[in-house]
Amino acid sequence: APALQDERRYAAGMLGQILGDSEGSRFYWSLVETGIAEEAQAQYDGRDGVGDFIVYASCGPEDAERVEDLLRQESARLADSLQEDDLVRVRSKVATAAALQGELPGGRMRRIGQRWTNLGAYRSLEEELAAIDAVTLQDLRDTAAAFPFEWTVTGTLDPQPE
């Protein structure tokens, strides 16, 4: 995934939300709403010089293989399934979260500190919202193509045998 210094971080964050937000995402509808998993999420984690997409789910051991298959299927088809209404919904979610975080002193200071530490520059909330609003459907598709959800590490936590 793109690094924090890469402007594609906005699209990457939105892709993570579309794929695996706790409500209304691809994972939510295919895994949580259907009762196959208790929880299934994906997120973008941008860092200094590197970024990752993190995917996880919680389910019973008897459903683990099926859940992993569905996670992989949804991840693989994300880029081809993106629609304009996905962009409208996620843009609204991300902008609202940024605005709410900006209203709290701790959230505002955390954002300022992270931006300064990682980017060496200050960006106002208005500039941040403009960058979110500037993301297009093609940006989402291009970012998904440049940074596909390829699984490099997979781990499981199983119940202890009795």
Regions found by a protein language model. Name each.
Residues 1-5, 17-65, 107, 129-151, ...:
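Non-catalytic beta-strand/loop surface segments
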Residues 21-22, 41-101:
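M16/insulysin-pitrilysin zinc metalloprotease superfamily fold
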Residues 77, 90-162:
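C-terminal regions of mature proteins
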Residues 6, 66-69, 118-123:
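Short acidic alpha-helix initiation/capping motifs at coil-to-helix transition points
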Residues 9:
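Double-stranded RNA-binding/processing signature
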